[in-house]
Amino acid sequence: SDLLHGYTGNSDWQNNYFPLKSLADEKGFIFCIPDGLRDSSNNQRWNATDVCCGPRNDLPDDSKYLREVIDSAIKKFSVDRKRIYSMGFSNGGSMSYRMAYDHSDILAAIAPIAGVGYKDKNKVIPKHPVHVLHIHGTGDAMVPFNGGDWAGAVDGQSPSNPAGDILGAVENLRNWAEYNKCNKEEEPKVRSIDLDSTLHGKDTTIIRFMNEKNNCTVELWKTHGAGHFIQWNAESRRKVVDWLLDHPK
């Protein structure tokens, strides 16, 4: 699995925000935490989607680079090719979406946190189904859950730039349900879970679309009251990892 940091973040920060080593040791998976290159403001970033933060021809081809990271891991390690994933936070979550658009041939699933796909759902259509777990706080002021103006300005992208408009989490989910031909909204057996360690009780509602024919799932974990930075603990991280491992190619 790739684990991708957000804008201004780096691999060390991401590893502290969502540590995976103990789960990797327990469950026997490998993960890569690459670093994005620096932009003109000296902040690390990913050239992801038109919302955050790309795609731009004058920036590095991060999609190609991350595919090379995956291919390199396959050559060096014993990898279950049916269980290759991408996970990211914020700009890294958008980059996970970009990877699913571009590399649906190899990715089984993605788990973007507070990320977003292309604003125009017809800009790029993935060739193969990819399971999607989108996680988003309803109180996110940086990447608004319901869409609208983007609170962050990155290399000239700002709320005054139409390309910076945020696609709402539910609209984004429905786009991927359409890509995957997940026409059936299914009532999950477990409707709510506890995700954010600072919120009381079962703070997260699950919305799920299924395609029983190709066994593809598109799911939204809507964390009520959480901001841009969901506060994780060992158990909530385990829920995300278990979801990914339960959704092979």
State where each predicted segment sits.
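Short beta-strand/loop motif that positions the catalytic acidic residue
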Residues: 134-136, 140
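Serine-hydrolase catalytic machinery in alpha/beta-hydrolase-like enzymes
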Residues: 1-85, 95-98, 102, 146, ...
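Primarily recognizes the serine-hydrolase "nucleophile elbow" in alpha/beta-hydrolase
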Residues: 74-130, 141
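Catalytic active-site module of serine/aspartate enzymes centered on a nucleophile-bearing elbow/loop
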Residues: 235-249
